[in-house]
């Protein structure tokens, strides 16, 4: 029998439980066999012969605090996102974002070495699931942007931005910020990049989310958006300049009326799915305490 206080800590998906187990096992392996770190973590100087660590580096944590935080965050965010995206797309998102994040970290570390000639950038071990977690925050921003987060009283669309601001601010007071800050920044950007341009939409057979509400400038305050938009437009044209016109042809009819697969319609449909999934989760968690209460009352009557 589940108690009311524990209902919110149940109903995690099987996929998220499996991924959480991978994180825990990965942490135990590097703790009991430290010699495996150079083979699993991303160490830029050794990445060329050990190219697989562009993948493995994201699936284990070097610290106990890291594995606890990553496991708990994965379970709760996956509990919401996986039903909306589907298990296959959720797993694909994690794999692609993790790989692209550590690929960018590798390139950045090599560039910093050639600029500064400091070997610390070549031999610093990069590892952890926090890049993917940053990307998952972007997924929450996309699906329920205007939903207020309980206790925090802030809208979900600002979660990635607040996380980055706090991480950058804390980097001035910590010595190991280089080990996590690039991963968080690239994880956030790669999560947005994947959802913006790559994620397949089964309803429309198109890819990505080109709606204005999910533009890159929405990560910034409105005061800065006139400056950010022209810069973002350059990268947008580089990524999908030719396909943009094709997408518009599919999204709009000749009369200018939006079709079912248009940007605004798809964005609204995605938010409705997210809100419905959130309501179902909350409804399930409320149903369990109510059911337990009815069972207790029934047991009491039987005893009488």
UniProtKB/Swiss-Prot annotation:
Compartments, record wording: Membrane
Q: Name one GO biological process term.
A: retrograde vesicle-mediated transport, Golgi to endoplasmic reticulum
- Where do the TM regions start and end? 23-43, 58-78, 93-113, 120-140, 158-175, 179-198
> What would be one Pfam family of this protein?
DUF1751
What keywords are assigned to this protein? Answer: Membrane, Transmembrane, Transmembrane helix
> What Gene Ontology cellular-component terms does the record carry?
Golgi apparatus; Golgi trans cisterna; membrane
Q: Where is the composition biased (Basic and acidic residues)?
A: 266-284
The principal localisation class reads membrane
User: Is Disulfide bond there in the keyword field?
Assistant: no
Membrane topology category? Multi-pass membrane protein
Q: Where is this region: Disordered?
A: 247-304
Q: Which family does it belong to?
A: Belongs to the peptidase S54 family.
Q: What does this protein do?
A: Probable rhomboid-type serine protease that catalyzes intramembrane proteolysis.
For this entry, the protein name equals Rhomboid-like protein 19
Query: What organism, scientifically named, is this protein from?
Result: Arabidopsis thaliana
């Amino acid at each position: 029998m589940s108690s009311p206080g524990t209902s919110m800590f149940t109903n995690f998906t099987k996929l998220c439980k499996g991924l959480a187990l991978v994180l825990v096992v990965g942490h135990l392996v590097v703790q009991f066999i430290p010699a495996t770190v150079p083979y699993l973590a991303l160490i830029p100087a050794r990445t060329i012969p050990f190219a697989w660590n562009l993948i493995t580096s994201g699936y284990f944590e070097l610290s106990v605090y890291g594995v606890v935080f990553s496991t708990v965050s994965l379970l709760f965010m996956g509990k919401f996102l996986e039903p909306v995206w589907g298990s296959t797309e959720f797993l694909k998102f994690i794999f692609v974002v993790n790989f692209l994040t550590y690929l960018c970290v590798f390139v950045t570390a090599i560039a910093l070495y050639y600029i500064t000639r400091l070997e610390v950038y070549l031999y610093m071990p990069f590892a952890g699931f926090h890049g993917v977690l940053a990307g998952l925050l972007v997924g929450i921003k996309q699906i329920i942007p205007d939903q207020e987060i309980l206790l925090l009283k802030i809208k979900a669309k600002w979660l990635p931005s607040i996380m980055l601001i706090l991480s950058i601010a804390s980097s001035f007071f910590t010595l190991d910020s280089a080990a996590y800050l690039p991963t968080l920044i690239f994880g956030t950007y790669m999560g947005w990049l994947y959802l913006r341009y790559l994620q397949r939409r089964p309803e429309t057979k198109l890819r990505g989310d080109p709606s204005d509400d999910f533009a890159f400038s929405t990560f910034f305050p409105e005061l800065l958006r006139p400056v950010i938009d022209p810069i973002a437009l350059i990268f947008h044209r580089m990524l999908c300049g030719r396909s943009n016109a094709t997408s518009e042809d599919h999204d709009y009819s000749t009369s200018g009326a939006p079709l079912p697969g248009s940007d605004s319609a798809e964005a609204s449909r995605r938010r409705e799915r997210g809100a419905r999934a959130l309501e179902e989760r909350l409804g399930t968690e409320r149903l369990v305490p109510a059911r337990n209460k009815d069972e207790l009352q029934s047991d009491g009557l039987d005893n009488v």
